Amino acid sequence: MSERRLLNAGGFAACAALLAYALYTQYYGGLEPCPLCIFQRIGIALLGVVFLAAALHHPRGRGRYLYALAIAIVALATLLVAARHVYVQSLPPGTLPSCGAPLSVLLKFTPLWEVVRKVLTGSGECAVVNWRFLGLSMPAWVLLWAFALGAAGVIANLRASSDDPQVMRRFADS
């Protein structure tokens, strides 16, 4: 198995583990996700799908650049949502609007772009920090993981592997 395929499969496994832990804390730990948490879960899930597609497809040549770009875009979007969440959690109490309607209600009665705008502005429920590990909240960990997975995915897919025909031609020409 090539190194790039293995790294993409590892990226998928890391995303799956992050989502599994998020679901564990929700259903067994009693932590209800706020709308920003749900957006971060969607981002990690999409990142996992891109990693899985890159591992299964494993394109040679220029095709790997498309996967590097897709990983970069999804990881950056997830990182930005997590950064917004960390910022919302750092604001002093009383500076955010009160908790609004649940995300399921917003999705049912509000246009999608308005839902995205409302979620990204944050609400009172997004400012609550009820979980920490090594002093960092869950959104801070998502921020770190999105950065690490995005960087690893981009580097792994930009770097030519030994099973790439272009690399083999370069070695044959020298």
Ranges and model annotations:
Residues S90-S137:
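Extracytosolic (periplasmic/ER-lumenal) interhelical loops and adjacent juxtamembrane/interface segments
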